[in-house]
Amino acid sequence: MKPAKSSPVQIARRGLMLVISSPSGAGKSTIARTLLETDRQIGLSVSVTTRQRRPSEVEDVHYHFKSVREFERLRDSDALLEWAEVHGNFYGTPREPVEQAMGEGRDMLFDIDWQGAQQLQEKMSADVVSIFVLPPTMTELQSRLHRRAEDSEEVIQTRLANSRAEIAHWREYDYVIVNDDLNAALDAVQSIVKAERLRRDRRHGMFDFVRELLEETPSL
């Protein structure tokens, strides 16, 4: 008679804050969307923003769209973990849903710029895993912005002008990926997430597991 299979070992851990940044058009949103579709342990931190909603975007799914006055009220009441002004618009991360998810062991994905990433590192560095996505060339970056066909030519040129300043912050991130092949870039991000979830200091349930393991008396 074969012995019954034991249940998979479940070790409690604290959720991680996965930050993915890049200049517009480098691929962070596509990578983020694919992660959310394929990994049930990851939830999206939905940012608040004052920018105009694009035709393809859904309220409270892609962003919480707010007026400048509403945004300032959230910021001034300490309801945002981080905030930044990007391309003339305000963006910020609501505090409450993130802290709740982290405490329950769920990972939160942040599609934010270097300013937001910097603020999160300053406030919650032990929880943050940051990834910067680079385009293979500036020419390809420009082509992707045109293919997206969601912004005017004026907006595209503004994004290109700002991209060099954004790229200059790549050294501030834990990991850097060149997105010349989307599948390869996605594989790299998934590998990072798997490894970071196994870090000893993130798995607070490991202490009890090891203690019980050492106290166990084997029985045949």
From Swiss-Prot:
Among the Pfam families in the record, one is Guanylate_kin
- Where in the cell? Cytoplasm
Alphabetical list of SUPFAM superfamilies matching this protein = P-loop containing nucleoside triphosphate hydrolases
Record's GO cellular component, any one?
cytosol
Which cysteine pairs are covalently linked by disulfides here? none
Instruction: Tell me which residues make up the Guanylate kinase-like domain.
Output: 15-194
List the keywords (alphabetical): ATP-binding, Cytoplasm, Kinase, Nucleotide-binding, Transferase
- Coiled-coil blocks: none
**Top-level taxon of origin:** Bacteria
Q: What class of enzyme is it?
A: transferase
Give the residues the record marks as binding ATP: 22-29
EC number of the protein: 2.7.4.8
Q: Which GO terms describe its molecular function?
A: ATP binding; guanylate kinase activity
PANTHER family in UniProt: GUANYLATE KINASE, GUANYLATE KINASE-RELATED
| Entry function | Essential for recycling GMP and indirectly, cGMP.
* Record family assignment: Belongs to the guanylate kinase family.
Q: What is this protein called?
A: Guanylate kinase
Q: What is the lineage of its organism?
A: Bacteria, Pseudomonadati, Pseudomonadota, Alphaproteobacteria, Hyphomicrobiales
Name the gene behind this protein.
gmk
